[in-house]
Amino acid sequence: MPRAHNGAVEIEYQSFGDDRPETVLLINGLGSQMTRWPEAFCARLVAKGYRAIRLDNRDTGLSSWLDGQSYVLADMANDAMAVLDAAGVKRAHIAGVSMGGMIVQRIAIDHPDRVLSLTSIMSAPSPDTLTSTPDAMAVLNVAPPDPKSDWEAYVAHGMANARTIGSPGYPWTDAELRARVEAEYARAFNPPGVVRQRKAIMADGDRIPELNKLDVPTVVLHGEDDPLVQPIGGQATAAAVPGAELRMIPGMGHDLPPGLYDIFLDAICTAASRAKANA
């Protein structure tokens, strides 16, 4: 796969549908790899007429791991801009989930000339609106078992975490969850990167005053049953961005199961269509 460069930081990315006239840049969440935007989902975007680009955030997947280095969300936003530059894209529709939603908010603030539309999914605009249930918070705070010492315990831990924060209306099978945990470990395993990414989230502080100044077609998508970033996060995001549309989805938690593909796609494509109408 190609790599973009932001100074010394290398960002792994993958592009689908390079012949399409407009691009959707997909940014994923805390500690998660680009594969959380499945190829099947990207193919659906291509079928709707868009080029789809997904990436590994710094400290995740096959991108640079920054041992002993600190950074902020603005740096991660600049990584995404480096990907657009490497892919030859001047402006894009941007969509992000969870921490990725925070990154696309930061992109819209810092790089408005690069943004055609914004879709913020299961995210929040400030630390005060980033709330979790105790069980979901444990997903972040309880370290996984050492996979080299007890592989089955590691897999069981990952599967249990996925069920804790997942969508109750769109459950995964045990076989699907096991396959995901195993595939993600085989691709890359970097727990310290999650710690640094969490610090970047908190360091970015309150984006609401800056979001108030945006002028970009925006759709905010959030699960009514999200335990990790509770609904106040989506509600506050939509309230912060002028003209934003809020879509609260029953049965949706904090993941992207196949049963939600159409809902995610419609949110992204609605924001993109509004950008075209305003052009």
Protein language model features and the residues they cover:
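Conserved HGGG/HGGXW glycine-rich cap/lid loop of the alpha/beta-hydrolase fold
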Residues: 7-65
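Active-site loop/oxyanion-hole signature of alpha/beta-hydrolase fold enzymes
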Residues: 59-95
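Conserved hydrolase catalytic core segment
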Residues: 91-130
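Flexible "cap/lid" loop of the alpha/beta hydrolase fold
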Residues: 117-149
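Conserved alpha/beta-hydrolase catalytic His-Asp/Glu region
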Residues: 152-196
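Short beta-strand/loop motif that positions the catalytic acidic residue
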Residues: 214, 220-222
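Acidic catalytic loop of the alpha/beta-hydrolase fold
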Residues: 225-229
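Catalytic active-site module of serine/aspartate enzymes centered on a nucleophile-bearing elbow/loop
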Residues: 244-279
